[in-house]
């Protein structure tokens, strides 16, 4: 049997032998493409290459691309587990030509690989072409020898691909595999095309046109090729299966689920095992690519996937977290092809377990609510939308999870009602917001980029430079001049030493000067990737386009910033060595006064761990090793051990920053892809100090630290505060900690004494407030400033002393009255503490109370003990 891993390797090796660059799978998080939640097709990483916005050092490429379809336009989530070919995660294999070869070669490559290398019978294959694409039809006859009846012309949009309303487009040709007449279904384009007999295995897109904004369509000067073959679907054919979930990889995951849950893989929980197997893949790969479960965006889609799998595990009997225990089975199947699974195994497992622990507590209660509501509805079919929203809002049930649970009961949900409830919540929670025109502003920078080209950055080697003003902007308007005044303007130079904010490093401050002109720059940003825009105010003279200026950054500020940036690199490596390789950067800020570093880490770091990390960073700084910067290909950098950071987009030539002494395995202590500015030697960073560690969101921790002059200032401030504390305690600084510990112990002892005195007072040593009414002992006391929590303990103590009777204790702590009433067991058939406390609460202006017949508690804004105790006496007289 040909394994899925063998098929993937054979596909890539074949196209590699045909002059294609084998490009590793891109992240599931699209880079610089806010229009997509996830990478949902093999061509997504090459989108800018096809549109001409990006160039690559190769014109042919092949990939096995990770793909997730679980949100937006491409959403297969609801069908997963119930069909043979739907997945949230799958691999899309493909070959691409960027103006290199076209239709003849694409068809030749596909036919040769399928029939020669993979050995598929030629009579089992047929092709579709766009109805107007006679070239493709002729090529299938010539190259593959297909007869007319096996070349099917399709006139619909299914066989014509568009990137969008504008941009590259072209006809498609799809290759189908025929399972034979023993399987129901008709060929593509027929009424029975949805059957399982004919299965699409490969789509060839011939990009030969360009759709213009005015609706016209022109020929592309350099036609291109984009193809896609779903690995899981093709593996099923190669392995003699008609169901993707029967292939070796999927079957191994299903068997792992069956073993852990002690439920037959093909028994009554067959669909649940399939859901778990599929969702395990999307969960693990998304976390490995930096997505963590959250309440919005990509994180929320991940949470939906995870919770759907967890509900199916619960259906099969899971009472504790088990989802994460399936991860080793996935790594065994796919870890060799995707080493990020191995690299981030600890983070993936901890994230899965933590999410399951959080959800398990809510799942049972939510399912109980759902069951109760269905019982209440009777024969009504649809669950009300407000109930579905309550499940979402209170118990964390995504709508599709509720729909999934209802599907098994033959019921549906009122989606319109759910959306109405959701809209009402958004309306309540959302602050008034008005669009700021940022989208229009971005158009300004696109135009500026087209007109002037990219900015030339000189700041790696110089902190000052002569430059020419290319443009001056305010908002969306380009200005003819900018006189001195209070308005901030944006300035574009042909070259600049100013660093534009990116990669976590803040932008430079400084000045632009010319005879009679001075501009103070207070921010520098990058726009459209490679435009450096200076923001500031003209404080003297008038600035005009074309003017020659002298640009100079604030040296002291840049020095502090680059120190913190270099310290961040050392901190990152120290964390990975001290805490674990699952630690990866989730965000950073490198400013003159501090650094902030967000990391993937499921639990808080201990004081000991933070101390060890801080010590390691300082030890590396003391080595004073040189910092080296080199340009190389991304493949060379990764081979050398450089870390590429999540969320950053890199070109084929990357800047690699190495610092610290290396060892036998690595040429340097820290090696990262980075475009920022850094110190010359690590000793220039100066002392390093971690200031705080805190949580940002589930699975993300934040470390804040300072170095250099900022660390020295912190040390002086800390020393000053410590001396102030020692002076107040009237002890030497060295004894301050022990003196504070002694005071805390003394306070603890005094607090216990006060509580004991209050207890004695309440139990009546010399302050008895006990009386007999109608043969019933009443111990009623107003204890003043005593907490409600203490009242209950005192009431229990007094009840034991009087043996038989009623105890009523009141207090007025924190501006609110409280009452506890205790009735001894022998009197509960005559008196109910809950009823008594509710009558008391009414007198106190409260809204009832609660408890048991022998002990109840209530409160209210008033603390009129005389009125309450009078009510109790009257009640006892009538008992």
UniProtKB/Swiss-Prot annotation:
<comment type="similarity">
    <text>Belongs to the class-II aminoacyl-tRNA synthetase family.</text>
</comment>
<dbReference type="GO" id="GO:0006419">
    <property type="term" value="P:alanyl-tRNA aminoacylation"/>
</dbReference>
<dbReference type="InterPro" id="IPR018162">
    <property type="entry name" value="Ala-tRNA-ligase_IIc_anticod-bd"/>
</dbReference>
<dbReference type="InterPro" id="IPR018164">
    <property type="entry name" value="Ala-tRNA-synth_IIc_N"/>
</dbReference>
<feature type="binding site">
    <location>
        <position position="678"/>
    </location>
    <ligand>
        <name>Zn(2+)</name>
    </ligand>
</feature>
<keyword id="KW-0648">Protein biosynthesis</keyword>
<keyword id="KW-0694">RNA-binding</keyword>
<dbReference type="GO" id="GO:0005829">
    <property type="term" value="C:cytosol"/>
</dbReference>
<dbReference type="Pfam" id="PF01411">
    <property type="entry name" value="tRNA-synt_2c"/>
</dbReference>
<protein>
    <recommendedName>
        <fullName>Alanine--tRNA ligase</fullName>
        <ecNumber>6.1.1.7</ecNumber>
    </recommendedName>
</protein>
<dbReference type="InterPro" id="IPR012947">
    <property type="entry name" value="tRNA_SAD"/>
</dbReference>
<keyword id="KW-0820">tRNA-binding</keyword>
<dbReference type="InterPro" id="IPR018165">
    <property type="entry name" value="Ala-tRNA-synth_IIc_core"/>
</dbReference>
<dbReference type="InterPro" id="IPR018163">
    <property type="entry name" value="Thr/Ala-tRNA-synth_IIc_edit"/>
</dbReference>
<dbReference type="GO" id="GO:0008270">
    <property type="term" value="F:zinc ion binding"/>
</dbReference>
<dbReference type="InterPro" id="IPR045864">
    <property type="entry name" value="aa-tRNA-synth_II/BPL/LPL"/>
</dbReference>
<dbReference type="InterPro" id="IPR009000">
    <property type="entry name" value="Transl_B-barrel_sf"/>
</dbReference>
<dbReference type="InterPro" id="IPR002318">
    <property type="entry name" value="Ala-tRNA-lgiase_IIc"/>
</dbReference>
<keyword id="KW-0436">Ligase</keyword>
<dbReference type="InterPro" id="IPR003156">
    <property type="entry name" value="DHHA1_dom"/>
</dbReference>
<keyword id="KW-0067">ATP-binding</keyword>
<dbReference type="GO" id="GO:0005524">
    <property type="term" value="F:ATP binding"/>
</dbReference>
<dbReference type="Pfam" id="PF02272">
    <property type="entry name" value="DHHA1"/>
</dbReference>
<feature type="binding site">
    <location>
        <position position="565"/>
    </location>
    <ligand>
        <name>Zn(2+)</name>
    </ligand>
</feature>
<comment type="function">
    <text>Catalyzes the attachment of alanine to tRNA(Ala) in a two-step reaction: alanine is first activated by ATP to form Ala-AMP and then transferred to the acceptor end of tRNA(Ala). Also edits incorrectly charged Ser-tRNA(Ala) and Gly-tRNA(Ala) via its editing domain.</text>
</comment>
<feature type="binding site">
    <location>
        <position position="569"/>
    </location>
    <ligand>
        <name>Zn(2+)</name>
    </ligand>
</feature>
<dbReference type="InterPro" id="IPR050058">
    <property type="entry name" value="Ala-tRNA_ligase"/>
</dbReference>
<keyword id="KW-0479">Metal-binding</keyword>
<keyword id="KW-0862">Zinc</keyword>
<feature type="binding site">
    <location>
        <position position="674"/>
    </location>
    <ligand>
        <name>Zn(2+)</name>
    </ligand>
</feature>
<keyword id="KW-0547">Nucleotide-binding</keyword>
<keyword id="KW-0963">Cytoplasm</keyword>
<keyword id="KW-0030">Aminoacyl-tRNA synthetase</keyword>
<dbReference type="GO" id="GO:0045892">
    <property type="term" value="P:negative regulation of DNA-templated transcription"/>
</dbReference>
<dbReference type="GO" id="GO:0000049">
    <property type="term" value="F:tRNA binding"/>
</dbReference>
<dbReference type="Pfam" id="PF07973">
    <property type="entry name" value="tRNA_SAD"/>
</dbReference>
<dbReference type="GO" id="GO:0002161">
    <property type="term" value="F:aminoacyl-tRNA deacylase activity"/>
</dbReference>
<dbReference type="InterPro" id="IPR023033">
    <property type="entry name" value="Ala_tRNA_ligase_euk/bac"/>
</dbReference>
<dbReference type="GO" id="GO:0004813">
    <property type="term" value="F:alanine-tRNA ligase activity"/>
</dbReference>
